[in-house]
């Protein structure tokens, strides 16, 4: 597995190889780290790339543990970070 990829296991036990788009840390919700990713080769019904995000905790043995984003406020913060990055890339 490449360094900029992770494997996500969905609720049905299916594995999805995903490209890491970006990671960031935020103190607003208890000094959490977040990863925004996109399943490789998967698109929505309009043919657009799919994006998702999760919180994660770094650990030595496994490299990290993914955690669900717990609140609407937390999702809004992640969406704001994603939009800021997208705007910056669009401006380049």
From Swiss-Prot:
It holds the Pfam family DUF1292. Transmembrane segments: none annotated. It comes from the Bacteria. InterPro entries: UPF0473. Belongs to the UPF0473 family. NCBIfam families: PRK13678.1-3. This is UPF0473 protein BA_4613/GBAA_4613/BAS4281. It comes from Bacillus anthracis.
